Every structure is written in C-alpha cells, then in structure tokens.
Amino acid sequence: MERSGGNGGGGGGGGGGGGGYGGSGGGGGGAGVPSEGAAKGLSLLLAKSAEAASGRASQSTPRSAGMDGFLKSDERQRLAKERREEREKCLAAREQQILEKQKRAKLQYEKQIEERWRKLEEQRQREDQKRAAVEEKRKQKLREEEERLEAMMRRSLERTQQLELKKKCSWAGSPGPGGRDGESENTPPLPLTLATSTPPLDTGTTTAAAESTNACDKLSTSTMNLPKQTESPMSKHLSSSTVAISYSPDRALGSPLKSSYKSSPTRTTEKKKNTPISAMGDAGKGAMAGGEPSQMEKMKKGRVATSAASGGHGSPLRRCEPPEDISKRLSSPVKSKITSKTYPQSPKTAKPTYLGSPVKYYFPPIANEETPKKKAEKEKRNKEKEGAPGQQSTVLPREESLEKRMADKYATEKYVADKHATEKHSAPGGKAEHSAGKPTAGTTDAGEAAKILAEKRRQARLQKEQEEQERLEKEERERLEKEELKRKAEEERLRIEMAYKREQEKKRQEEEEKRKAEEKAKEKAEEELLSKEKQEKEKQEQEKKEKAMIEKQKEAAEAKAQDAAKQMRLEREQIMLQIEQERLERKKRIDEIMKRTRKSDASLEVKKEDPKVELQPPPDVENKANKAKPVVPNKIEINVLNTCQKVSGSERAAPETFPQDIFSTGLKPVGGPVHLDVLDGKSNSLDDSTEDVQSMDVSPVSKEELISIPEFSPVSEMIPGMSLDQNGTGNARALQDILDFTGPPAFPKKSSENLSLDDCNKNLIEGFNSPGQETTLNTFC
C-alpha cells in the first residue's frame, strides 16, 4: 500500500499522493497530516504533461488494483493463519489447564489419603502408649501392693514376737495362777522397738519364728509367680474357706497363748500326740471345748503341710505329713469357718486378765499403724495423677475402688475387734479361772502361731491376688473387646472408604469411556454425514450429467425427428401437389369431355331439329369457367404450412408428363401417412370443384346417347387439331376410358328413369370421389 502510494505521488512526498495512504504511513513529515502529502503530490502532478499523466494513470490503475487485490488476499491469509494459531493456542492452554486441574485434584486426594493414614498411625501410637502406660501403672501398683502386704506381715510378726516375749516373761515371773494373772494384768505391752531389740530367751522359738518368716516370704514370692492354671483349683477352695478368716479378730488379737518352752521339733511332736489324749480324758470340759483341740490340730497339720510344700524346706516330720489332712482341709471349708468363729472363744486364746486389768492391753489397729505409709502413698499417687492426668484416667477408678475396699476392710476389722473385746470383758470369771488353772492343756509354741498367721495371711493374699487377677483379666478382656470393636470399625471404615474410592474411580472411568464413546460416535456421525453429503453431491452431479446427456440425446432426437418430419412433409407436399395437379388435369379432361359431349348432343339435336334443349350454357357459368381457367389457387395446409400454387391456362394446356412407372392406377404410391387435415383440404377443394361443375347446365341425355359417346383417348387429346370425328370413336368409348382411368364405381348404378338433368355430372363427380378412390389416396399418403 505504501508502494502504490509512492508510485502515485512521487518519491519526494514519501507516498503522499496515493489517495491519503501516504499520510498514515508515509516516510516524510506527513505522518498524521494527509493534506501536506496531498498538496505535494498535486504540485508534482501539475508539473508533468497531461499526456504522460493520463498514460501513467491508465497504466498505474490496473497495476495498483492488482497489487491491492494481491495484498488483500495475502492479508486475509495471514489473518486466517493468525486466527488458526490463536485458536490452537487457546485449545492447548485449555487442555493444559484441564491437565493441571486433574493433577492438582490427584495430589490433593493423595495428600488427604496420606493425612488420613498419618492420623490413624498417630492414633494407634497414642493407643499403644496409653496401653503401655496403663500396663506400667498396673505393674507398679502390684509392686506397691506387694510391698504393703510384706510390711503388714512383718509388723504382724513383730507384734506376735512381742506378745510371746511378754507371755514368757509373765509365765517365768509367776508360776501360780494368781501371780501370772497379776503380772499379766499390770504388765503393759512392750513397744515395737523393745520387741525387736530384746533377744529371744529360747533358741527354738527364734528358729521357729525365722522358719515361719522365711516360709511366709517364700509363699508370697511363690504365689506371686504361680500361673493361672495351678491357682484355679486350689484358690476356689481357699476363697470359700478364707472369707471369714480374713475378717476374723485373730488378725487384731493375734495368738497370746503360745508356749515358749518349746525347744525342739520332737517336743512339738510329743505335744501333738498328747493333746488329743488330754482332751479326751478331760471330762469337765464341754463338747465345744473338747472338740476344739482336735480341730485345731487338724488345721495345724494341714497348714504345716501346705507351708512345707510351698516353702520347700522344714523339719522331716513336717515333710512326712500325709496328704490326707490337706485333702480333708481343702474339701471341707466348713471346718475352717467353725474354727475361725470358735477360736476367739476358746479358753486357750481368751485372756480376760488383760481386759480386766486397770491398764488394758490395747492393740492399735492396722489402719492406724499404716497411716504414715498410706499418707506417703496417697501423696505419691496425687503427684502422679497431677503429672499424667491423661494416662491415669483409666486407672483412677480402680485405685479409688481399691482404697475404698481397704478402708471398709479395716473398719470392719476394727469393729469386730471391739466387739470381741467387749464380749471378753463381759465373760464370767469362772471360765477364766478354769482356763488359768490348766496351763499345759492348750499351750502352743510361737512357731505354730506364726505358721497359722502366715497361712491365714497367705490365703488372704491369694484370695486378693486372685480377685485382682480376675478383675485385671476382665478389664483386659473388655479392653481387648473394645480394641477389637474399634479395629473392626476402623477396618470397616477403611473398607467403606476404599469401596467408595473404587466406586469413584470406576465412575470416573465410566464417564471417561462414555465421553470417549460419545466423541467417537460424534466423529463417526460427522464422517458419515460428510460421506453422505459427498455421495449426495456425487449423485447430484451424476444426475446432472445424465440429465444433460438425456437432454442432448433428446435434442438430437428432436432434431432428427424434425429433419425427418420436414423431409416427410416436403415429400407429402410434393405428393399432394402431384395429386392436385392430377386432379386438376382430370377435372380439365372431364370438362373437355363434357364440352365435347354437349357439342355432340347439340349437333345431334340440331340434326333432329328438336328445340327442347339449348346447348349454350348460361353466361354466368361460362364466366365462372373463364375466371377459373387463368389462375387456380390451391391452398393446402399440412402441419401448419400453407402452400399456394398458381396455375395458368398455358400450364394447364401443357400439363406435366410423368413417367410410366409413377402411376399404376393413375397415382404414385407413397409410404408415409396422410393427415386428416390434408384430406379435409382435399375434400374442400373437391367440393368447390363439384360446385363449379354442378353449376353448369347440362342437357339430359339418355343411356343410349351416353353409350354413343365417341372414344376418348388422352393421347389423342394431347395432340392438338384432332377432333372426335377424326378419332373415329364414339361417346361410349370416351366414357369407358374415363371409367378405366378413375377406376370402377363403388356405388350401385342408377337406372335412367331415376336420373334428372344434373344426374350425369353428379354421377361423374361421385364416381371420381368414390370411397375406393379415398382409400387409394389414404394408402398412397
């Protein structure tokens, strides 16, 4: 565009004369000022000649138009290319966005799954830590309970030893009943420190106490390590037999009547042998007092056997004890209950002198002795609770229930001890004197008492441990059930989540497949549509070609048909002209014949002098004949074509001569069809001719006269100067020639009687226009 402007306006203006193009894109100072560039262009144009300007304009106009068109097509192509590139970029950017969105969604989903698994793992770790903390707390609690029970056992053993020492001192100081009672009443209980620091007086007592202590320790350690299978049969019997023992007042009262003069195991066996004999020989005792020693001996034997079996050491006599006593004791728990109930009321264990003394012997309860340790334990527990409140939430109800049970237990023991103390205080003095009078009847040593106490404590500990074990097992089962339920719920949730994930993935895949199938179907439909359109176009083109070919063929056929029809029409016209000429010739000959006939008739009548008939025709008929002679118009319509023919008198006088082979019966055969309008025209012309002929006045002739017509010959007629007389023929011969020429008549002959004046001419005309002649004409045409 700039180049065309430069060509139009010159090089100095920078394209200023290019119709305003130089103003917008010119190189000089005319950018943005189109008027200056136009003025420069006009000044340069005025400097040149008009011829050069006109020639240049005439040369530059088509060049600029061609360049503009070329540049416009290039611009359109460039714009179309830019649009295509822009569309492709948009599609690529959209696909990239879709891919990024899918990638982000996938990353988000994976992140959510990882976060969920991480949370589940953290929750599992927290549960494991919580379970470990609970287990550690339970073990610590069991250790503390074990230490507390051991401390209780040690304190009870120290108290028992203190009582035994006090008893020995009282028995050694006053051998009589009075002195012993007084000492026992006035002697206060020794403190724990004194009991522990005072050396024992008898070596047998110390050894028995040591053995009992070791046995208790071994029993405690062995029962802690016993499995559940070994504890179940024995613990069931012990639990029923030690319910009353654990809450009996023997724990608070101890066993004050223990013999301290036992020095060897042989002495113990002798005492065991003599005790039933002395009990059976004593008749002053009641049934209850007599039955108690035997029951006590049985219990002692059973307990010694169990302690020896669990401890694994002891005297040979204890090892050799038969197992029948153990089975009896385990199978009959009622005996232990009876002994526990009757043991405080026996004369051997009851000491009314202590209760009746002004300085009463007061046994401090176990709860009061354990208060400092319990306080320390409570403070420690409170600190642990404050330090780990989340971990102790599950253990707190257990500790509270355990402390509550222990407090109830201590309160019950205190109440039972007070009750027995009041009963002993209100008991009659005779029974006390009776018991005091027999110092050797129910005496036992310190070892037996320690063993009995250790057995009771062991049974209580076993029962407690069994209950604790059952409770822990129950809690463990509940915890496992809860964990199992939680695990199942978590598995179910994960299964549902995975199923949902699979369902979503399946749904997404189905949607993707459906979308792809739809795209494929759409592409296939488009391809089918394009193929259909292509086929339709091809079909239309083929139809157009076929139509064009058919049209061409039709036109060619029509042209051929028109040529053939034209040729046939020309032939028919020629034939009709020939027929018309022949008809006119025949008519002419008939007229000549008629004239000659009239002349002959007139001559005959003149000869006969018969003035009836005038031979001269009327003047109007002659005028008509004369008028018809010079010009004969023949108008024939064949397929909308009019043909006029003028026939002069000279031409009629010298008609055309046709070859011999044209007319076999006077006509030329033609193979083409003849239309009806031709025949109508012919019939009309014939009617006109008949009218002309009928208008003539012909004199009536008879049959004989017609027969006597002289002979007529066309050859003789052609020769001028010949007459009927010279020919030597009559009228009959002429009529015969006419009939031979025109053919036989196709109608019945009429008689002469029925003929009128005009019948002769009419007969001739009808003979000429007979149906046979028409058929011959139709066959010719």
Curated annotation (Swiss-Prot):
UniProt biased composition (Polar residues): 211-245, 257-267, 329-348
Signal peptide stretch: none
Superkingdom, natural source: Eukaryota
Tissue: Expressed predominantly in the glomerular layer of the olfactory bulb and Sertoli cells of the testis.
Biased composition (Low complexity): 192-210
Region of interest called Disordered, as start-end residue ranges on this chain: 1-37, 50-87, 120-567, 597-628
Localization of this protein: Cytoplasm, Cytoskeleton, Microtubule organizing center, Centrosome; Midbody; Cytoplasm, Cytoskeleton; Cell projection, Neuron projection
GO biological process: axon development; microtubule cytoskeleton organization
GO molecular function, one term: kinesin binding
Pfam family, one: MAP7
A cellular component annotation (GO) from this entry: neuron projection
Role description: Microtubule-stabilizing protein involved in the control of cell motility and neurite outgrowth. Acts as a critical cofactor for kinesin transport; in the proximal axon regulates kinesin-1 family members, KIF5A, KIF5B and KIF5C recruitment to microtubules and contributes to kinesin-1-mediated transport in the axons.
Subunit structure: Interacts (via N-terminus) with microtubules; facilitates microtubule stabilization. Interacts with kinesin-1 family members, KIF5A, KIF5B and KIF5C.
Family according to the record: Belongs to the MAP7 family.
Entry protein name: MAP7 domain-containing protein 2
Organism: Mus musculus
